[in-house]
Amino acid sequence: MKLNTLMKSYYSSYDYNQLRDETKSQYKYHIGIMLDTCLEDKPIGNLDCANVTSRMAKEAYDIWCDRGVSLANHVLSASRIAINYGLHMELCLVNPFLSVKRRGTTPRKTIWTREQVQTFLDTAYNDFHSRNIGLIAQMAYEWCQRLGDMRVLKWEDIDFDMKRVHIKQSKRRAEVFLPI
């Protein structure tokens, strides 16, 4: 079975279709990069699953790393997941991407000091047009939640009697109740 055919099977699977739309889109993008990567003058997608070796998977990973280590790690993860589906469905015998070691990435996080947070909030609250941004940022900071989750809060999410806010976290889909 060709890798292209295996991926079509994965895209029609229950496993894939139960993912969030954003995750499906990201997987399709990253798997597309994997399938289009040329090794030995052929796209990997045109190769038979049984003919893709660990060496080839490592060579493909090195090619992806030339575009960025973070991208390469995402492509590797999506490829592993999709080919593992093939293993479970007995469509292929091995997953050559499992033996590829990921390269580390430098964290993209910038940690603000309390003074920087205070300066940001002071600036936001001093201007009428940016006060809403300040409020969203302060709630995210105080409750350790994602900015996007704060942005979609509604008044009905606040229970003033119980003095708590109800938040549905977008990443984990968890529902949390935080004191206000």
Model-derived features: positions:
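Short functional hotspots where side chains directly engage DNA or cofactors
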Residues: 98-99, 162-168
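N-terminal core-binding DNA-recognition domain of tyrosine recombinases/integrases
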Residues: 8-22, 32-108, 122-124
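Hydrophobic (often cysteine-bearing) scaffold residues that line and stabilize catalytic clefts
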Residues: 3, 20-23, 27, 71, ...
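Generic structural marker for isolated residues within well-ordered, non-membrane alpha-helices
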Residues: 31-32, 136
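Basic, Lys/Arg- and aromatic-enriched nucleic-acid-binding interface segment
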Residues: 69, 73-75, 88, 92, ...
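Short, surface-exposed helix/turn micro-motifs that flank interaction/cofactor sites
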Residues: 80, 151-152
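A short, basic/aromatic helix-end/turn motif that makes direct DNA contacts
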Residues: 152-158
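C-terminal catalytic core of Y-nucleophile DNA break-rejoin enzymes
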Residues: 22, 106, 170-180
